[in-house]
Amino acid sequence: MNSLRLEPISRVAGEVNLPGSKSVSNRALLLAALARGTTRLTNLLDSDDIRHMLAALTQLGVKYKLSADKTECTVHGLGRSFAVSAPVNLFLGNAGTAMRPLCAALCLGSGEYMLGGEPRMEERPIGHLVDCLALKGAHIQYLKKDGYPPLVVDAKGLWGGDVHVDGSVSSQFLTAFLMAAPAMAPVIPRIHIKGELVSKPYIDITLHIMNSSGVVIEHDNYKLFYIKGNQSIVSPGDFLVEGDASSASYFLAAGAIKGKVRVTGIGKHSIGDIHFADVLERMGARITWGDDFIEAEQGPLHGVDMDMNHIPDXAMTIAXVALFAEGPTSIRNIYNWRVKETDRLHAMATDVRKLGVSEEGDLHYITVTPPTQLKHAEIDTYKHHRIAMCFSLVALSDIAVTINDPGCTSKTFPDYFDKLASVSQAV
């Protein structure tokens, strides 16, 4: 296994321009494929998850042209649901942003599709979504364990009418239904949410992209979603993929801990995990908001006790910032960490203990109490890109840190460590 030793960083300063958002990129690609007309996507993320979506779209008969640097993609929309004459086997890696929405979208058309991926994908639940789709006429069969991929979709279309979606496990279940809803007939559904909807900013991302594609969806405090009738997905022409607010969190955290960093490609009107900056501000960092940037500057940091369900990705970075804060930090209402690309709660708890950090928690929270002195540790990333990136911040202390399998950042941010080095000054 490859590893990367990061030597202590004395200070960070500078500006980082963000790559496109993974969540936005894959949603936009799927909608562009289904839309009437041609869509030009710019600032597309070039990463493993996006490559899996593009490969799937190719197998589904979608034509597109990718620029040499893979950040611009012109997609020729089908203007209809997917239809194939022979069975198609789609390998989706560990990309939940491809697996869940594609599962629903494929049910709208015709043909037989096998959806599978890496071993971890077989541990990521999809049963709530499949159950809802089955109530609307979907024919889906599990190939191994009930409730989990791999699975086979025998597509024959979906019925309309009201549906109840469990929002407590993953917002991607709701996203999948929202993206499929305009094509459901004869009655466009109302979507009722069971439980407390997790990761609401990611639903805002879905609603924004669908609105750009001609589909207006309204909601009642995230409890009931209304899709107006007589709407169809149409190309927006040009669509700019916004920077990844979750990726911004590492650089904003670095500025809050030891210097001053400006991140461009997102701003005060952005959606997604930008509320991470609000948490940094509550911890004592100085935050400046612009239309197209967010800047974080070092301040005396103190621990917080907060519900961070709305920022599930960036909350991991808060666990790393907590190592530099005065007093304990409690990150609450994060049960859905356990059903991400890896069991994030287990991974975070295991790795912070290696650093000499006092940690406690259960299925729903983690509390981190920093020691007087961190210890050098080899951080196991569990093939999880965000674990690699958030633990890189340990180098902002006076000890080095070793990141095992640093290449796992290719899922969302292939050149992350180069970008970190560009704003870092060695001790």
Curated annotation (Swiss-Prot):
Residues holding 3-phosphoshikimate: 22-23, 27, 170-172, 199, 313, 336, 340
Keywords attached to this entry: Amino-acid biosynthesis, Aromatic amino acid biosynthesis, Cytoplasm, Transferase
Location (main, coarse): cytoplasm
Listed InterPro entries: Enolpyruvate_Tfrase_dom, Enolpyruvate_Tfrase_sf, EPSP_synthase, EPSP_synthase_CS, RNA3'P_cycl/enolpyr_Trfase_a/b
Residues annotated as the enzyme's active site: 313
Pfam family of the protein (one): EPSP_synthase
Cellular-component GO terms for this entry: cytoplasm
Gene3D superfamilies: Enolpyruvate transferase domain
GO molecular function, one term: 3-phosphoshikimate 1-carboxyvinyltransferase activity
Residues that bind phosphoenolpyruvate: 22, 96, 124, 172, 344, 386, 411
Pathway per the UniProt entry: Metabolic intermediate biosynthesis; chorismate biosynthesis; chorismate from D-erythrose 4-phosphate and phosphoenolpyruvate: step 6/7
Localization terms from the record: Cytoplasm
Quaternary structure annotation from Swiss-Prot or TrEMBL: Monomer.
Function comment: Catalyzes the transfer of the enolpyruvyl moiety of phosphoenolpyruvate (PEP) to the 5-hydroxyl of shikimate-3-phosphate (S3P) to produce enolpyruvyl shikimate-3-phosphate and inorganic phosphate.
Family in the record: Belongs to the EPSP synthase family.
PANTHER family in UniProt: AROM/DEHYDROQUINATE SYNTHASE, PENTAFUNCTIONAL AROM POLYPEPTIDE
Protein's name in the database: 3-phosphoshikimate 1-carboxyvinyltransferase
Source species of the chain: Aeromonas salmonicida
Gene expressing this chain: aroA
